[in-house]
Each structure stands twice: as structure tokens, then as C-alpha cells.
Amino acid sequence: MAASKPVEAAVVAAAVPSSGSGVGGGGTAGPGTGGLPRWQLALAVGAPLLLGAGAIYLWSRQQRRREARGRGDASGLKRNSERKTPEGRASPAPGSGHPEGPGAHLDMNSLDRAQAAKNKGNKYFKAGKYEQAIQCYTEAISLCPTEKNVDLSTFYQNRAAAFEQLQKWKEVAQDCTKAVELNPKYVKALFRRAKAHEKLDNKKECLEDVTAVCILEGFQNQQSMLLADKVLKLLGKEKAKEKYKNREPLMPSPQFIKSYFSSFTDDIISQPMLKGEKSDEDKDKEGEALEVKENSGYLKAKQYMEEENYDKIISECSKEIDAEGKYMAEALLLRATFYLLIGNANAAKPDLDKVISLKEANVKLRANALIKRGSMYMQQQQPLLSTQDFNMAADIDPQNADVYHHRGQLKILLDQVEEAVADFDECIRLRPESALAQAQKCFALYRQAYTGNNSSQIQAAMKGFEEVIKKFPRCAEGYALYAQALTDQQQFGKADEMYDKCIDLEPDNATTYVHKGLLQLQWKQDLDRGLELISKAIEIDNKCDFAYETMGTIEVQRGNMEKAIDMFNKAINLAKSEMEMAHLYSLCDAAHAQTEVAKKYGLKPPTL
């Protein structure tokens, strides 16, 4: 399969296909589009433009260049990450100096008394006497002239800090709100309120506050970035859990399904029907399957597969299973596979469990079920169960090349590159004609060399890619993986040629167009051409969530938040796993939060 995902994470190609966020829940940064945080090898699935902590906020690159221009002390903006201590005397905002005139002396005395009370409170605070500190800050608030907004905001923020030490989160939020009302860009108060909202489980409010903090700080403070990432993940998981259980199953595109099955060579259920299994009668005008010589739901399902009439497969398999027919084990495995393809892992697991437990079933059926269940476990972030299933598959069917091929992908995801290469070697020994395994072995070696910064090994891996595409000129995946390695090496022109080869071989593979579009942005900063190619991907396959997600990400960077949110929502509706959906909700929520913060604080998003 060509240009599936940014080749970073991996194992889903074997089981729960996901053209969105991929498999793992983290991992190390590696080569690919812009140092993405996860590796996805992906034979049959397209991966997303993944974003790490804080990077979801796509203003960071531009904001960092501004080096705190236009930020006065009144904002409370500081570069250190420690925020627990109260503040000393606040500097007035520009234009808010002490008034001159008849009442100036009285105001100064009132302000001085307020400052003295605050200073006394600070001493109590540092001594751990928070109740006494609160009394002093309350006195400062009552003494302070009402027109002294900046000073008043500091007193409220200091009192909030004392309430925070007593874990009185409601009072913390209330005092921080007062401080922000008086000084809208008061970073320290905004962040303290964000933490209080987190404790009160007010995730939406927490996200808006911490988003404002990240923007005002220019994405320079790790503490606020981590909180932003944390709350986005929590919101994403919460929303995905509710949405996913009520989602309508959706069959992926024919290209996606064919690519998925192409990653298996020892899979009985995906092999063409034998001559004895069907008659020579033509199919009727209604598109019904060719008559099979046996009254078998499974054989009808197989015929529908050959006709790419995928929507009827699950029901025909169910007929075979209900009748306890001759092909019951095959029907269970085929039904489970299509449950996985439509993103219904809960329905797939019982079928896979049953096939695995059928000792009398063909060993290749049981091994294939173990591969798919193991890959499903990996997508659910259960690596121990996943590893157990792959090892069991190798034990019961040691001559099955698929076991080593897909276990190799698992090992890459687990950062066990040497073991991955050994598995790919075993797959190649068993199936010398396996172009996919040879291409993925090259990529595993390349990744190892890249992360180890070993230039000679990088060159050896690049030479290996050349040999693979020369030996297997019809393997689109070889060109796709090579293109991603070339992109890492800044060889953009040659990478573009490799993507063109992929498109020639698989013109209906939408993900290749997305990768080629991203390359135009990285290589030539050609936004129009990049968007044209991603739009072409959607035209080819309107179920390609990778394309919608990437389009949404670019629209955020262009400042088109409404369109970005629309793209993310389309991707959410196409997500094939709860984890993928949670990731997409995080992107969508980040865009929503930036929109609200921009309105509230008058911040105009920078554009590409």
C-alpha cells in the first residue's frame, strides 16, 4: 500500500485500521513530517498530522518570534515556571500612574496602607500562615482605592494564592476572576484560575484560561503547556467515549479495504475463491453474488468481496455462523475483520476469541485471528496483551510470514528496532517476494540510524530503499516510505518524485495526495498547491479522515477557525477507533478555545 500515514506508528495495518490518529499513545519523536511524536508504519492505514503538548495550539511558531513584545508588567507575565508565591508591589500599567491633583495625597495614603497590609500578608504567606495572610489581603482589598485596578488585581491574586494553599478551589477561582476583570491579561491570575478550574472539573473553562496563558506567554512556559495538553486529552477522551459508543458504523473506501488486505499473504479469508466454490453463472442485474455451488453464507460473502460489494459481507457471514455451517470458523474471522474495518472492536473481539479457541480450525485462521486481536490490543494501548497474542501466533504457526511482518511493526512501535528487523528478516526468509516487508525493514533501519544520528547507517538505509524500489518497482509502499525518509534528509525534489510514483501505481489512494500536499508546504511553502492536493484527496475518497484532519490543521494556521472546526468534525465522524476520535476532539477543542480567547482578548491569529 502506498503512502498511508506519515509512517510513524504501525501496528494497525494488521488489525484495527485507522486513517486518523494511529495506534500508540505517545512514543518518541522521529523522522517524518516535522518530527512527529509517534512512529507509524502503517501498511493500510493513513496517519494524522500529530501534535505534541502545546503544539496543538498552532500559533506557537509565530508567537515565539515575538519575544514578548508589547507585554507590560501589568500582565503578570514571567518566564519562570514557579507560580506559588504571592506578588510584591505591582507595577502600574502604562497610563495608570498615581493621579495628580487635589485628592492625590489621600489616595496615596490609602494605597500605602493597602500595600502595607499586603506586605504583611506576604510575610504570613511565606511563613505558611495562610488564614492570617488571607485576612491581610482582604484588608488590602478594602483599603485600596477602586480606581487602582492593577494594585487591586494583585491583592485578589495574592488572596487566591493563599486560598490555593488551603485547597479552597471555589474561592481561588472567584478571586482570580476578580483579578482578571481588573487586569484582563493578568497571566498569573489566569493560570491560577485554570488550575482551580481543573480541580473543580470545569474542563472547558480550564482550557480557555490555559489557552490564553499559552498565547500571552508565547508558548514559552512548560508548566502551562503541559496543563493545556492534559486538559485537551481529558476533554478528548471524555467526548470520544460518549460519541464513539453511539456512532454509526461506516464502511471505509474500497481502496482502504484493498490496501488493508494487501498486508496479509497467509490469510485464507482474503484469498480469491477457488473454481469449485462458485458456478459460472453471470451475476444478475441487481448485483447479487454469483451463485455458489454450496448454500453457504460465507462463500457468498467471499464473492461479495471479489465484487467489492462490502456492505453485504457481515450479514452473509452471520448466516453461516447462525447455521453452524461448514465454514463457520472462516465466517467468524471474516466477520470480525469487517467489524474491525468499520471500527467496531467490541463486536470483533468475541468472534476473534472464538476462532482462536477452535482447536480444530485451520491453524492459519487461528494465527490470523491472533494477529488481528494483538493489533487491536495495541491500538487500545495494551502492549502486553498484544505481545502475548503475536508470540502465541508465532508458536502455533511458525511458518506464517504474516506473523513476523506484523509483529515487526509492533516492535517498531515499542521502540524495539533490532527485534523488528529480525522479524522482518524472518518474514523475508519465508516470503522472499514480500516487497512490503523489505521496504519496512529499510524504514526500520533508517529510523534506527536517524534517531542515533548515525550518518553512515542513514546512507546505508537510503541505499537499501533504492534497491527495494529497483527490485519491486510495483510496490507503492516502497516509494512512500522512501519519500518520507528523503523528506527527512531535505531531498524534497526526489521525495516528490517518489510520491508521483505512488500516485501512478495507486491513483485512488487518497493519503498519497495528502503527503504530497504536505511536502509542498514544507518544501516550497506553496500553500495553494498543498491545499489543492489535499482537496484532491477528499475528492478521491470522501471518507479519508486523514485529509480532513490535515486540512483542518492547515486552516487553523491560516486563522480560518470555523473551517478548521468543520474539517475536524468531519474527521471525527469518520474516526475508526475511540482513541483516534479522542485525538481529533483534542484538535477541535483547541481550535474552539483559540476562537473564544481571540474574541475575549482581541488577539488576531497569525496566518501562514
Swiss-Prot record:
PANTHER family: MITOCHONDRIAL IMPORT RECEPTOR SUBUNIT TOM70. Its main location: mitochondrion. PROSITE patterns: TPR, TPR_REGION. The modification N6-acetyllysine is found at residue 185. TPR repeats lie at residues 114-147, 153-186, 294-327, 329-362, 367-400, 401-434, 440-475, 476-509, 511-544, 545-578. GO terms for biological process: activation of innate immune response; cellular response to virus; negative regulation of cell growth involved in cardiac muscle cell development; positive regulation of defense response to virus by host; positive regulation of interferon-beta production; positive regulation of protein targeting to mitochondrion; protein import into mitochondrial matrix; protein insertion into mitochondrial inner membrane. Forms part of the preprotein translocase complex of the outer mitochondrial membrane (TOM complex) which consists of at least 7 different proteins (TOMM5, TOMM6, TOMM7, TOMM20, TOMM22, TOMM40 and TOMM70). Interacts with CAPN8. Interacts with TRADD, TRAF6 and STING. Interacts with MAVS; the interaction is enhanced by Sendai virus infection. Interacts with HSPA8 and HSP90AA1; both interactions are required for preprotein mitochondrial import. The interaction with HSP90AA1 is direct and mediates the association of TOMM70 with IRF3 and TBK1. (Microbial infection) Interacts (via C-terminus) with SARS coronaviru/SARS-CoV and SARS coronavirus-2/SARS-CoV-2 virus protein ORF9b. It is a single-pass membrane protein. InterPro entries: TPR-like_helical_dom_sf (IPR011990), TPR_rpt (IPR019734). The modification Phosphoserine is found at residues 91, 96, 110, 434. Belongs to the Tom70 family. It comes from Homo sapiens. GO terms for cellular component: extracellular exosome; membrane; mitochondrial membrane; mitochondrial outer membrane; mitochondrial outer membrane translocase complex; mitochondrion; TOM complex. It holds the Pfam family TPR_1. The lineage of its organism: Eukaryota, Metazoa, Chordata, Craniata, Vertebrata. Residues 2-38 are mitochondrial intermembrane. This is Mitochondrial import receptor subunit TOM70. It is found in: Mitochondrion outer membrane. Keywords: Acetylation, Host-virus interaction, Isopeptide bond, Membrane, Methylation, Mitochondrion, Mitochondrion outer membrane, Phosphoprotein, Repeat, TPR repeat, Transmembrane, Transmembrane helix, Ubl conjugation. There is a cross-link at residue 275 (Glycyl lysine isopeptide (Lys-Gly) (interchain with G-Cter in SUMO2)). The chain crosses the membrane at residues 39-59. It comes from the Eukaryota. The modification Omega-N-methylarginine is found at residue 71. Acts as a receptor of the preprotein translocase complex of the outer mitochondrial membrane (TOM complex). Recognizes and mediates the translocation of mitochondrial preproteins from the cytosol into the mitochondria in a chaperone dependent manner. Mediates TBK1 and IRF3 activation induced by MAVS in response to Sendai virus infection and promotes host antiviral responses during virus infection. Upon Sendai virus infection, recruits HSP90AA1:IRF3:BAX in mitochondrion and the complex induces apoptosis. The modification N-acetylalanine is found at residue 2. Residues 60-608 are cytoplasmic. One of its GO terms (molecular function) is protein transmembrane transporter activity.
